[in-house]
Amino acid sequence: MSDPFIGPDEAPASALEQLLISRRAFVAGTAASAFVLWTPQVKAAVELEGVQIEETITAYGKKLVLNGIGLRKRGYFKADVTALYLPERRTTAEAVMKLDGLRRIQLNILREFTSSTISRIFIADFKQVATDDEFKRLIDVIGQIGAAYANVKRVTKGDVVNLDWVPGRGWMATHNGKQLTGDQAEDPMAINNELAYQIYLRMYIGPHAPAELRNGLLGLTRMNRVGGGTVNPEP
């Protein structure tokens, strides 16, 4: 009996042809699945002044979330895009200070600074936000931080400086991945003083910090996502 769906000039596929067609379909399907599985996942990021900041990172084996970003200025100049990473998002300076665990201030440099300029700015800002008693108590620590900055001859646009508080290890600073501070108690470059780091945080989220920068780092302003969309302020 003839097949009504086969034209007069067509012949039914042989068993071998059907097998080959099935194999081709299987290989094509497998390749498509593999492509989906191995396609690299693009990390979510926000953008400010052309700088892309990842919304989640891993540092010292711990996951951190982006709390906020802000533009830091020096006079009329744009100095850096600052990012604050925390274990959990917080919207007040007091809550950030009380938070246990790893914290990171990340500076994405927008213009060139020499090490002497960086040290001078740091000391002036630190003295402004610390009490007289705190400044006197931490004078040796301030000297250590100044020595760490001296290891960086200059920073230029595109450089990344991370300033971390790591429980049990202390204040860890890196410039483009190069470590500037020590993490052993006997190391003269080790800075294991949490008060000093909290005072450093005040420079960015304390009452003396510019309101625009402070609100941005505390997640109180909208952040623009790379590729479209926004990260809205915390309620």
Walk through the language-model features, giving the residues of each.
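N-terminal secretory signal peptides
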Residues: 1-21, 30-36, 45-97
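Soluble periplasmic/extracytoplasmic beta-strand elements of cell-envelope proteins
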Residues: 65, 83-85, 104-108, 172
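Mid-length scaffold segments of soluble, non-membrane domains
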Residues: 90, 95-162, 166
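Short strand-turn-strand beta-turns centered on an Asx-Gly dipeptide
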Residues: 175-177
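Flexible glycine-rich active-site/ligand-binding loops centered on an Asp-His dyad
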Residues: 183-211
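Cysteine/selenocysteine-centered motifs that mediate thiol-based redox chemistry or coordinate metal-sulfur cofactors
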Residues: 212-235
